[in-house]
């Protein structure tokens, strides 16, 4: 039996062709392929996008880099593609220019991924400076021959300043006070006075406050070297409602070049005047009936709580398990791209969350983490954190959701990254170990059976929903072996019901 499992594990590794990945490195000057005459060359890219990402380089210090992603055009010339070269030029006080070459580890055997999606890759690099215009251009290799038009794709990208939610973590910005939140409030006390409140910065000891419209209406300096809420009254020369309050800090790290913050002057809320004695008596007479009604309501509520408590004590011995709060079970769900996410995966997720108290992990909900960690690292981390891994397989019978999900370009199904083949290849080595095999479950939607490249999953426990719903729930609750989990298993078994 062990020999059969080993053969199955070995066969599942070679069942699917290896998908190309990228290996990137710096390349200065023309690519070597440019010096060679080519009969045929690959076409240009289909799409090129740029966004900012924050990466940690030391304790409380971050580097801001470009996350450049591109989509390959789905045509026959993709079989000739060897690499993609990306060049970035920046224009500011100092011009910059650098290039990277990303080689594809495998030759492309198809115009699209085996799952049906377009080939998409991304590279994180190229440090980003503040308020700089960048030109990002990319072309495929081998590129066009000399004296021929070279297909390429370019985009412009202007990096924001220190108040951007990503750029504010850049060291230059943090030293200028980008992470400081002064929480400025300003209100018009009267025609001649504005009250400004703000939280000081412990790195500074001096602040300048300007109240401006078309001209400066008021001015004040504040000296404070401790973290505290400060209030200052500033005389103004004319109407101040709607005027701009500009707060300039002078911090040790940035001196006279710190980030200025702004607020707006609004009307101060009116304070209540003392109520005359006659009005006090009148108000007391109006509130007395309401007070009596509230007193009766509180008494009724207390009596109800007492009766409920007594009834709970009398039934506690008869139904001890039903009152237990079941701990959550972490379940990683992987599914092929042909499954309709909204009609099938979401309903299956609701089934796990609502009836068996499961904490569900889906790649659809963690795209940002996948982009930061990479799909292999993300799958490995989630497998270790999960109590169970569920392979969700579709039915052979077409459902109505197919028309709703759609296969047209730009649909959610096309844009979603298919991690099912990668998860299958990554986890299938566990199928030969009885120690790890208990962690994996196969769930069919309808009457389908395993076929094709995923026959290695046949060694895992298999369930058809909703026919095997009860057995599926029981298997889920075997994540731990403690006595409390056995009690929870019975409670979940009694409370679970079909979708």
Swiss-Prot record:
Gene Ontology molecular function, alphabetical: cytokine receptor activity; interleukin-17 receptor activity
Topological region Extracellular: 18-286
Key words, A-Z: Cell membrane, Glycoprotein, Membrane, Receptor, Secreted, Signal, Transmembrane, Transmembrane helix
Keyword Transmembrane set for record: yes
Residues in compartment: Cytoplasmic: 308-499
TM helices/strands, residue ranges: 287-307
Domain SEFIR positions: 328-474
UniProt xrefs under InterPro entries: IL-17_rcpt-like (IPR039465), IL17R_fnIII_D1 (IPR032356), IL17RA/B_FnIII-like_1_sf (IPR038683), IL17RA/B_FnIII-like_2_sf (IPR043046), SEFIR_dom (IPR013568)
Any Pfam family: IL17R_fnIII_D1
UniProt signal peptide: 1-17
BP terms from Gene Ontology: positive regulation of inflammatory response; positive regulation of interleukin-13 production; positive regulation of interleukin-5 production
PROSITE patterns for the chain: SEFIR
Glycosylation: residue positions: 67, 103, 156, 197
More about this protein: Evi27 is a common site of retroviral integration in Bxh2 murine myeloid leukemias, localized near the Il17rb gene. Proviral integrations result in increased expression of Il17rb on the cell surface.
Subunit structure: Interacts with DAZAP2. Interacts with TRAF3IP2.
Identification of the protein by name: Interleukin-17 receptor B
Species assigned in the record: Mus musculus
Lineage: Eukaryota, Metazoa, Chordata, Craniata, Vertebrata
